[in-house]
Amino acid sequence: VQQEPATVAYQAGHATVAGSCCTDLKALFNEDFVLPRPVVSNDDGTVLNAYNGSLRAGDEINKLAANVSIGRDAAGVHYRSDGIDGLVVGEQQALTLLREASTLLNEDFDGFTLSLFDGSRVRITDGQIIYEH
C-alpha cells in the first residue's frame, strides 16, 4: 500500500500559479490579437495543417491556464474544483500585484485592461481596480 502525501488538495497550487501568470500576460499583451497562420497537427502528430478558425491571444492564454489546471486533475492529484478555484485565487493575486504596480509608474499610463476568467473586464489604474460592465 502506497501512502499519499499528507497535503491538502484545495486549492491547486499549479492552478494558482497558472491563474496568476496568465492574468499578468493578459494585462501586458493585446488579448484581441489574432494569431497569424495558426496550424493544427494531424491525428498522429506528424504533419501540421493550416487551422481555418481564428485564434485570439487572450483565448489561448486562458486555454494555457485551463490546461495546467486540468492536467493535474487527470493525474489524480486534484479535483476539478481545486483547479478552478486555484485559477481564481491566482487571478486575484495578480490583480493585487497589478493594482500596486499601477501606482509605481513614472510615465503616463492609461492602466491595464484585461478580461477575467469569468469573462468580465477590468481596468487597473492609479491603484484602483475598476470593473467594467
Predicted regions located by residue number:
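Membrane-embedded catalytic cores of phosphoryl/pyrophosphoryl-handling enzymes
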Residues: 1-133
